[in-house]
From Swiss-Prot:
SUPFAM superfamilies listed in its UniProt record: PRTase-like (SSF53271)
Annotated organism of origin: Synechocystis sp. (strain ATCC 27184 / PCC 6803 / Kazusa)
Chief location category: cytoplasm
PANTHER family: ADENINE PHOSPHORIBOSYLTRANSFERASE
Keywords: Cytoplasm, Glycosyltransferase, Purine salvage, Transferase
KW Plastid (keyword) present: no
Top-tier EC class: transferase
Family: Belongs to the purine/pyrimidine phosphoribosyltransferase family.
CC per GO annotation: cytoplasm
Protein name in the entry: Adenine phosphoribosyltransferase
Length: 172
């Protein structure tokens, strides 16, 4: 299946010069959604990635991470922007092109030696995925790899990630 055909391009969003890759059209296709999740599962299995938990990054990582976790018989853990989780959290700060940002995870979400797979809809510069991996590693988890639907290859995001398996289904 041609997933690119199911991803809508929106020029100049959210600002001029940006080509936004809109996955809502993919999500709207039952066949496309099933193919996407099945493809992620197949690639994880072929690389022997068997997580205890799938970690989805806010917010579109939730859309693909939860069905992937279900199919892989794993738990799902959200990593969120600050102030979105109600219980005590662990936090990691990371650099953006113009400033800083941070991510949080519930303190009781993971335990040392949990095997985790990090999922998001898209990898661009890799900063968010890298920060998520650093946080989980600091908490004693074994990060097995990363899974993305879209990879913006020109931004070299995979270069900043740890030397682990990286799955991406569509490359721009």
């Amino acid at each position: 299946m041609d997933l690119k055909a199911l991803i809508r391009d929106i020029p100049d969003f959210p600002k001029p010069g940006i080509m936004f890759r809109d996955i809502t059209t993919l999500l709207n296709s039952p066949e496309g959604l099933r193919y996407t999740i099945d493809s992620l599962v197949e690639q994880c299995e072929s690389q022997e990635l068997v997580p205890d938990h799938v970690v989805g990054m806010e917010s579109r990582g939730f859309l693909f991470g939860m069905p992937l976790a279900y199919q892989m018989n794993a738990g799902f853990i959200p990593v969120r922007k600050p102030g979105k989780l109600p219980a005590p959290v662990h936090r990691v700060e990371y650099d953006l092109e113009y400033g800083k940002d941070s991510l949080e995870i519930h303190q009781d979400a993971v335990a040392p030696h949990h095997r985790v797979l990090i999922v998001d809809d898209l990898i661009a510069t890799g900063g968010t995925a890298k920060a998520t991996a650093e946080l989980l590693t600091k908490l004693g988890c074994e990060v097995l790899g990363f899974a993305f639907i879209i990879e913006l290859a020109a931004l070299n995001g995979r270069q900043c990630l740890p030397d682990l398996p990286i799955i991406s289904l569509v490359e721009y």
